[in-house]
UniProtKB/Swiss-Prot annotation:
Record keywords, A-Z: Cytoplasm, Fatty acid biosynthesis, Fatty acid metabolism, Isomerase, Lipid biosynthesis, Lipid metabolism, Lyase
Keyword Phosphoprotein attributed: no
InterPro entries in the cross-refs: FabA (IPR010083), FabA_FabZ (IPR013114), HotDog_dom_sf (IPR029069)
Protein source organism: Xanthomonas oryzae pv. oryzae (strain KACC10331 / KXO85)
Cysteine pairs bridged by disulfides in the record: none
The protein, known as: 3-hydroxydecanoyl-[acyl-carrier-protein] dehydratase
Gene Ontology molecular-function annotations: (3R)-hydroxyacyl-[acyl-carrier-protein] dehydratase activity; trans-2-decenoyl-acyl-carrier-protein isomerase activity
Pfam family membership, one: FabA
Pathway(s) of this molecule: Lipid metabolism; fatty acid biosynthesis
Keyword flag Lyase: yes
Gene responsible for this protein: fabA
Active site: 70
One Gene Ontology term from the biological process aspect of the record: unsaturated fatty acid biosynthetic process
Length: 171
């Protein structure tokens, strides 16, 4: 498939099934773990470091699966799901630029949570800036990311790392 600059939810779910890119390419998780509804922008230029950018959105609805269990009587989106979305988008970037293998989160340098996503929110926006891509024996992307809810920044993560592996047997 030709690289696009934006992707719909149906295309992202096709990625989860291995139908969007080459069969040996990385995949996004399927529902309900896919944590964004669309990628509105993806490029291997631009961003804060000039090495690439990814922008994505998640429509918030009170019936999203995590609100029913986290927490009963005090529904809030788990912070780890927002962080996972940032790793998902970083891995998608690697697949989008042609990296082969299975994506795995490798860590991050720093994470700050300064707000929360409640069922009354409308829109979560993810902004990912690629700071480094290694494409040798080790295939890895490093990014900085922000998560905004209804236009207000609530999560910041620095030095997110995702690698691509041809075998995860001994991972």
């Amino acid at each position: 498939m030709t690289r696009q600059s934006a992707y719909s939810r149906d295309q992202l779910l096709a990625s989860a099934r291995g139908e969007l890119f080459a069969p040996d390419s990385g995949r996004l998780p399927n529902d309900p773990m896919l944590m964004f509804d669309r990628i509105t922008e993806i490029s291997d230029t631009g961003g804060a470091h000039g090495k690439g950018v990814i922008r994505a959105e998640l429509d918030i609805r009170p019936d999203l699966w995590f609100f029913g269990c986290h927490f009963i009587g005090d529904p809030v989106m788990p912070g780890c799901l927002g962080l996972d979305a940032m790793w998902q988008l970083t891995g998608f970037f690697l697949t989008w630029i042609g990296a082969q293998g299975r994506g795995r989160a490798l860590g991050c340098g720093e994470v700050k949570f300064t707000g929360q996503v409640l069922p009354s929110a409308q829109l979560v926006r993810y902004e990912i800036d690629v700071s480094r891509v290694i494409n040798r024996k080790l295939v890895m992307a490093q990014t900085d990311a922000r998560m905004l809810v209804d236009g207000r920044e609530i999560y910041v993560a620095k030095d997110l790392r995702v690698g691509m592996f041809t075998s995860t047997e001994n991972f």
